[in-house]
Amino acid sequence: MKLIISGGGTGGHIFPAVAIANEVRRRHPEAEILFVGANGRMEMTRVPDAGYKIVGLDITGLQRRLTPQNLMFPVRVFRAVRKAGKLIEEFRPDAVVGVGGYASAPVLLAATSRAIPSLIQEQNSYAGLVNKLLAKRVNRICVAYDGMEKFFPADKLVLTGNPVRSEISLGDRSAALHFFGLDPSKQTLLVVGGSLGARTLNQATAAALTRLQEAGIQLLWQTGKLYFPEARQQADQAAGLHALEFIQRMDLAYAAADVVISRAGALSVSELCLTGKACILVPSPNVAEDHQTKNALALVSKGAAVLITDEHAPARLYDEALRLLSDPERQQQLSLRVRELARPDATVTIVDELLKLVRK
């Protein structure tokens, strides 16, 4: 069996793609799996780290304003589709999976034009433009939220949930506290700005460090690369405040946390559901169709999360966080409700659908 998985750009696309590949390889150890990403993006290093080969396309997204790069966009797309077509003809995959990100569209266009079975994995509650355009061409669309028939043909939809790393919910709290050097007698707040960081969360957290100390709250703070030097300097001045550029052991970070502050990317939301963590979501305003707000509202509408807008975060985020940290009953209520939304078998179900296409 040969499989191409295309897409990337952020952890929210890369980690589900790797989870799908791992499940395919678990069932079919002989499978040949090739990733296709965008040159210069995160997947070009993260995918090889996970043990898979990746090939890069020279493709970027459209800018929101008129730029010279936008004028070249059609040329780049044409070249990327042509290169993707050559890759497909050389590799001869039995199926192609698109997980979103710049490289996903050229590969799916090339695959569907050659009648190769194709599957889209849409992570968000609001479908992106590219996936909506590709929907008529692909064979199957795996989604994470109810109501997606307003974007896609209903006969192609399968409600699966999002693939999440299987170990993410297996962290042991005692081991986690020891790993991060945290005090078991104190509450722990985890702040995660996504794999690329988040300026609003970082600035609000930096401004609240004294308040957290005074309240006896411990902090695990994933800053992203750009803010890390400043955050480390600030956090090093106080006990119990830990700034990290990137948290490799998210299973232990979730296990240690009593409350989580996070962006509302699809992967983050799925992980919070699976780990059952009381959470405050601050959707990024810098995403297509404001899809993070829609992801967050899917939880908030069921009483499973708190939402603070990016605009209001500087003034309100840590007032709300400290209230929640001081209210164990509310933490437990949010935890129970968010866990009800988890789909722990998402990866298995997606690979089931993929293998059905291969066997046809």
How should these model regions be labeled?
Residues L3-T10, E30-R79, Y227, T309-E311:
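Conserved nucleotide-sugar phosphate-binding/catalytic loop shared by glycosyltransferases and other
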Residues K53, T112-S174:
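Active-site-proximal region of nucleotide-activated glycan assembly enzymes
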Residues G85-V96, S104-L119, K132-R137:
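Glycosyltransferases and closely related glycan-assembly transferases
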Residues P93-A95, I247, A255-S270, K277-A278:
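Acidic donor-binding loop of glycosyltransferase active sites
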Residues S262, A278-E289:
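Short hydrophobic beta-strand element within catalytic cores of glycosyltransferases
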Residues R330-P344:
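A short, well-ordered alpha-helix in the C-terminal region of glycosyltransferases
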Residues R343-K360:
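C-terminal alpha-helical cap of glycosyltransferases
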